[in-house]
Amino acid sequence: MSKPQTPSPWRIIQPVRAQIRRAMLFSAAAIVLGTAALLLMAHILQGLLNNRADWFSAALLAALALAAFFLRGYAFRVSHLAAFRLETILRGELADRLARVSLGYLHDHGAAALTKVMQDDVRGLHAFIADSTPLYARAYAAPLISFAVLLFVDWRLAMVAAAVLAAGMVVFSLTVRNAGESTAAYNAAREQVNTAVVEFVQAMPVVRTFDGGETSFGRYQRALDNYLAMLIGWYRSVGGSARTGMLMLNPAPTLIALLWAGFYWFCADALPFGTWLAVLLLGTGMAEALTPYISLYHLIEQGKISAERIIEVLDAFVLPVLAPPQTPQDAGVCFEHVSFRYLGRSKNALTDISFTAPAGSLTALVGGSGAGKTTAVRLIPRFWDADSGSIRIGGADIRHLAPETLMAQVAFVFQDNFLFSGSIADNIRLGTPNASDAEVEAAARAAQCHDFIAALPQGYQTPVGERGATLSGGERQRITIARAILQNRPILILDEATAFADAENEALLMRALAALMQNKTVLMIAHRLATIRHADQILVFDRGCLVEQGDHAALIAQNGRYARLWQAGQTARHWRIGG
């Protein structure tokens, strides 16, 4: 069975291919001028040995060397500009793709792996373009040009130089025949070390509290040991042949061979000294041009691996928009026999869920952890697609809505709230960048966060730090609520929106939310049942199934799952330490 082909970097460097070709052209021109300079140098040295100074040739030599220098520098400039341009394009395309793939793809691959693609792999491809483009011309064009000139100058010494370099290339080729697998193993081991380092540092408070660092440090040490073992194994298997190949591609063996062969023919009066001198310069130049081939090979292999991961993300499945396009007639939400299973799981997360949340109503979703509440509401904005059944907004199947149309319908306040590194005002404006300061402040007042924001030294311009680290959990939650208030979308999904509210602010927050909820369809996930007792309907989930639905009074009267949850909540409210 043949192995799947590794994606070529050339597929994704299409936008800068013209710049790459231009860089190669200038690099090749520099090589031609450099070769001509070597021949001219041999001519000048021969003249000096004959007590003849050729000032015109000396001036021409300086001009050729200077022109080759500037052409080589310009080639590197063009290749680096192309690399920066490609880096910008790829990061934009990756961000656009990740914004359109399902949340399931992001969940399955993980933030760390996707961050590596957008940072390390794009940077690796940058190095491939910036550094390898001029090296291509040097490693391939220079030896060919030098060999052609050598054949013209003296075919015998040309064959001697070619034999030495050919032997070195054979040894090097045997060394790198499985380099792709070795590089992949190296990258995997390095990623394990990076992951262990991040885990060890980020988990330091927990580590010091519970195990003194032994467990987390043990993972880090095992990752380092695995990395070291991989490197030692590679070195033992190919280290000797790799060193031999590199030594044979070094200019020294070629120079020694040309010295011995040239000396033999020179003593036999079969080789003019000037020709011998020219061959020495050209032959060692040809060998020196092959030196970057080793670095070039590794750059290409690393570029292919980076390209493979980038292409995988760029080709990630985007949830399709079905035809014909539909338009919601109102903000009602309807689930019709919806079932869903997470990728790789053996059991459904949701099974045959059906309910209707009329436009302008408040629907509460309750149940134990893992019951399916959050999964259900996250299917509404198509974070995943249901395996069967359908979800409708205003009578329109969400699979027939354009992404921008669908997202314009739904505002979300997640339980695991997230703030970007920026000011408080910027975080509230997320999704509504043109909102005025007055509108931002009004949203903050409604979310009960204006007072603590105004008390900060910089007010609404206060930086929140990485992931909102400078704010408390409750403050972050209220800012995300202010963000949803400002967006003013017809469907509002609240996932434990009051989870971090203290007793003093919970009533104020609930009144603010009650005012916000007017004329909106609200789906609210809550564990504090007292906060949703006045909901228009309550959906009770258990193990992925909708087991009960109705208002508070009706569900209490049924004396079923909801009634037991309510009773447990009442008991917890009156519980005290010590009895």
Task: Show which residues each predicted segment covers.
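Transmembrane helix-loop-helix hairpins at lipid-water interfaces of multipass membrane proteins
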Residues: 17-71, 152-156
